């Protein structure tokens, strides 16, 4: 099997990832589980050749010098793939994550109605958080697409690498990739504020400078979308504040409290019928009460504010999980694995 055939097999089987690892057969991740493909083990030379075929000269050089490399590429009429190539004990290896060529809408994803209202905000910061592989990019792409279909403005994305490719519909869209188009998130963000954007998407808020610039962008009248690898709204606020030195923490809390519009923390769970995965969300909206808690460093009280803010569109992860169990979408055991309070999901 050549790489194109393998990737076609991946897409056909609705797999999220293809794993190539010297000395082993290719493997795919389907609905969260890694499975072997029934083909012979691949030698180092074969895996190395496959990886090199889809790299450009700059990426090959980077891979040789750093022993790992992130990039994305497309197979025409199939899909785009986000790739991490690396070296392991048996030789060359790579993981290819499928990025569907069609951007799903908020309706396609069965997102809560409040997501469209969040995307409609004219300014502020909206964070989508969760572990790797929890569908953050897919949710954000749907929110950007909503903006693109309903408003006339300039959307600027800064990604590493570019995942979903957006067409300019009602909006002008410019997508920049760290590496080929800009040297860093912080460089691109600094320039972004002079590029007349209405919306800025920051693929990953990974360091102090990027976080500071994203907050400044939100403060100066732009809508900023960003992602973090945190599992709840409270942990997200703590994670942002913790990046800054003690002397700045109070100022950063004030900045977040002014600009935060929503934090959506999501996780994927296997459906009860075993045919796929479904997202569960904690949703925090930047209400006056929430902003106050952030400003006063009472983040621990945020959970109960979210719990009691249902009429405002808020929900805790456990509330969402309970609904999904009641609707027979997921099993109690699956919900218990992700729940904050496991006792709510006794039995199986």
Predicted regions and their residues:
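Short, flexible helix-loop junctions that flank or precede catalytic/ligand sites
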Residues: 1-348
């Amino acid at each position: 099997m050549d790489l194109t055939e393998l990737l076609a097999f991946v897409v056909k089987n609705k797999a999220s990832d293809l794993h190539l690892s010297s000395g082993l057969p290719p493997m795919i991740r389907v609905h969260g589980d890694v499975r072997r493909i029934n083909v012979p083990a691949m030698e180092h030379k074969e895996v190395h050749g496959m990886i090199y075929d889809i790299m450009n000269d700059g990426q090959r050089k980077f891979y040789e010098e750093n022993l790992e490399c992130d990039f994305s590429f497309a197979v025409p009429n199939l899909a785009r793939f986000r790739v991490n190539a690396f070296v392991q004990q048996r030789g060359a290896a790579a993981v290819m994550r499928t990025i569907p060529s069609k951007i799903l809408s908020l309706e396609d994803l069965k997102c809560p109605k409040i997501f469209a209202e969040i995307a409609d905000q004219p300014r502020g910061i909206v964070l989508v958080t969760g572990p790797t592989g929890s569908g953050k990019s897919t949710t954000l792409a749907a929110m950007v697409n909503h903006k693109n279909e309903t408003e006339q403005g300039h959307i600027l994305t800064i990604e590493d690498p570019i995942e979903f490719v957006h067409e300019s519909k009602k909006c002008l869209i410019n997508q920049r990739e760290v590496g080929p188009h800009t040297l860093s998130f912080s460089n691109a963000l600094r320039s972004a504020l002079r590029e007349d954007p209405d919306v800025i998407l920051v693929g990953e808020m990974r360091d102090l400078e990027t976080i500071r610039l994203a907050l400044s962008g939100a403060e100066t009248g732009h809508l900023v979308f960003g992602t973090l690898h945190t599992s709840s709204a409270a942990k997200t606020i703590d994670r942002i504040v913790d990046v800054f030195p003690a002397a700045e923490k109070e100022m950063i809390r004030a900045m977040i409290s002014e600009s935060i519009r929503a934090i959506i923390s999501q996780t994927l769970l296997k459906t009860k019928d075993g045919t796929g995965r479904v997202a569960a969300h904690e949703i925090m909206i930047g209400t006056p009460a929430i902003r106050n808690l952030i400003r006063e460093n009472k983040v621990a009280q945020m959970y109960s504010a979210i719990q009691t803010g249902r009429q405002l569109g808020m929900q805790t992860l456990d509330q969402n999980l309970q609904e999904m169990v009641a609707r027979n979408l997921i099993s109690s055991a699956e919900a218990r694995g992700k729940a904050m309070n496991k006792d709510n999901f006794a039995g199986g």
